């Protein structure tokens, strides 16, 4: 039998749209620990600022899409804020469409055909979303884009000035759409950038990584890894198979 273990689902600047073809995903601790854990064969996971704990060890196969907050509104018809800190069964979001898609993917024999099937399904959802026509506030979109462009290092006071809103008004409108305050979003974007650098075949040292990604110092980087990943940076890298070429 395969040994049962766990791995951490760390914060990201994208929502997770996942469909299982073999096995299920068992959430032992939700991104928001106040929410009830569960087992899913298809789900969307919202943006979050704490690590989820996921059971590992059982064989699994599936398809995952990294979904932007804009994509959540287009495909699902709701703001990313509605999913913040949560993992929601796809059937409760898309109804029969979710179950039909899972069945079609399971009966399709090649990965190429599965990708094509999923792409077509997402295209239909996007077209329906465009007909609904509700667009996020352009100021919120601008603010997010600026945080991404700067790797999460832009000061929120400066961001508010660029947008032309008070910091408090920006925080409220941003949170209403995305689910995180701008400061938390910047933190997640910066953390994800550090994770990407750390997974490179020849990663930088932690002091260099901290400086390159806009952390105050190495201790600041270490604190973010403890709080966002539940692990040290070194332990987090060792847990990732592609970090060692596996």
Regions found by a protein language model. Give the residues of each.
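DNA major-groove recognition helix of helix-turn-helix
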Residues: 174, 186, 224-226, 237
């Amino acid at each position: 039998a395969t040994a049962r273990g766990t791995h951490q689902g760390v914060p990201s600047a994208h929502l997770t749209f996942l469909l299982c073809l073999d096995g299920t995903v068992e959430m032992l601790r939700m991104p928001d620990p106040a929410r009830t854990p569960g087992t899913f064969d298809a789900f969307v996971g919202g943006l979050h600022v704490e690590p989820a704990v996921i059971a590992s060890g059982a064989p699994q196969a599936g398809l995952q899409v990294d979904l932007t907050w804009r994509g959540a509104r287009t495909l699902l018809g709701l703001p990313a804020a509605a999913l913040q800190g949560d993992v929601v069964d796809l059937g409760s979001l898309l109804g029969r469409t979710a179950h039909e898609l899972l069945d079609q993917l399971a009966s399709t024999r090649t990965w190429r055909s599965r990708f094509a099937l999923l792409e077509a399904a997402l295209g239909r959802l996007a077209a329906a979303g465009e007909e609904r026509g509700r667009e996020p506030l352009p100021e919120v979109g601008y603010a997010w884009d600026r945080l991404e462009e700067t790797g999460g290092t832009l000061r929120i006071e400066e961001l508010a000035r660029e947008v032309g809103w008070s910091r408090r008004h920006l925080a409220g409108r941003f949170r209403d759409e995305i689910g995180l305050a701008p400061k938390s979003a910047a933190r997640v974007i910066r953390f994800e950038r550090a994770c990407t650098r750390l997974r490179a075949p020849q990663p930088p040292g932690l002091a260099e990584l901290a400086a390159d990604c806009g952390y105050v110092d190495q201790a600041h980087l270490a604190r973010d890894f403890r709080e966002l990943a539940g692990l040290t940076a070194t332990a987090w890298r060792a847990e990732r198979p592609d970090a060692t070429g596996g």
